[in-house]
Amino acid sequence: MESLTLQPIARVDGTINLPGSKSVSNRALLLAALAHGKTVLTNLLDSDDVRHMLNALTALGVSYTLSADRTRCEIIGNGGPLHAESARELFLGNAGTAMRPLAAALCLGSNDIVLTGEPRMKERPIGHLVDALRQGGAKITYLEQENYPPLRLQGGFTGGNVDVDGSVSSQFLTALLMTAPLAPEDTVIRIKGDLVSKPYIDITLNLMKTFGVEIENQHYQQFVVKGGQSYQSPGTYLVEGDASSASYFLAAAAIRGGTVKVTGIGRNSMQGDIRFADVLEKMGATICWGDDYISCTRGELNAIDMDMNHIPDAAMTIATAALFAKGTTTLRNIYNWRVKESDRLFAMATELRKVGAEVEEGHDFIRITPPEKLKFAEIATYNDHRMAMCFSLVALSDTPVTILDPKCTAKTFPDYFEQLARISQPG
């Protein structure tokens, strides 16, 4: 297996221009494909997950052109639901941001298509979304294991009253919200359980509004969506930088700055993961906010005990930053780490122990006590981009670290290690 050894980093300093947000890129691509008119997306993320969405749109007959660097995409909207005339099966890798929204969107009309993906995708639950779509009339068959992909979709979603469990993934609600305006009837979506990752729903609602559709949000408990609507192209749309990707550079600055500035997101960003900067500030770093940037300067870091439900992806970065904080850090209410690209609670606990930390892994929490000195280790990444990026921070000590399968960062940030090297000074 390929590996990358990072030598100790004495200091980080500089500016990082963030690649486009994965969450925003894939939502914007699908809405542009469903919309009337031509949409130009700029600062689109070029990554595996986005390529899976683009390949799916091609198979579904959507016409688009990409710039040479794949960050500018001109899409001719379909002016309504997508039709799987020639496509029989779509392979979506491990891209939840493609699988969940497409599973809903392709239940409109009378399609007959199979959605499948990598082995890990077949372990990521989708039952709550399928249950909700079936309540709205969709005909969906599990082809292997009940409640998991692959799925056969045969259209039939017309709207109506739909209950969806919000406790596992906000992507199920996102998928329903994006699809419901195109259904022939009105849809009332009721949330069962506590809604996780609420800020990701705000991204969805924000983008739908950009594409001309507004819905009634009743305190995140119920959403009322008028049927028979259509999305309208906003013309040109700039995809903001990826706030989850920003977390590694901001944390690096908190641990070994200097000052690092990330551009492409700022105080008005629609992504909830910008709140990661508040957590670093609480730990002792100095944060400065601009309209189009966030900067972080090193501080003496202290442990925290916090509910991380609002920033599940960026919270992983706090788990490795905790290695450099004084005291025991506890991250709570993060059960949904278990159903991401890997079982992130298990993976994080296992790899933190390798570098010498004392770790308690609970059903929905992790507690981390750093060692006096970090140990050299080979870090397994579980084909999970965030594991690779999180554990790169170990090199901000006097200890090198080896990352196995470093290219797994291609899911969201293909040149992550080059960008980290650019702001790093060797120890």
Curated annotation (Swiss-Prot):
Presence of keyword Transferase: yes
Reaction equations catalysed: 3-phosphoshikimate + phosphoenolpyruvate = 5-O-(1-carboxyvinyl)-3-phosphoshikimate + phosphate
PANTHER family in the record: AROM/DEHYDROQUINATE SYNTHASE, PENTAFUNCTIONAL AROM POLYPEPTIDE
Biological process terms in GO annotation: amino acid biosynthetic process; aromatic amino acid family biosynthetic process; chorismate biosynthetic process
GO molecular function terms attached to this record: 3-phosphoshikimate 1-carboxyvinyltransferase activity
Family of the protein in this entry: Belongs to the EPSP synthase family.
Pathway membership: Metabolic intermediate biosynthesis; chorismate biosynthesis; chorismate from D-erythrose 4-phosphate and phosphoenolpyruvate: step 6/7
InterPro entries, alphabetized: Enolpyruvate_Tfrase_dom, Enolpyruvate_Tfrase_sf, EPSP_synthase, EPSP_synthase_CS, RNA3'P_cycl/enolpyr_Trfase_a/b
Subcellular localization: Cytoplasm
EC number(s) reported in the record: 2.5.1.19
Annotated protein name in UniProt: 3-phosphoshikimate 1-carboxyvinyltransferase
One CC-aspect GO term: cytoplasm
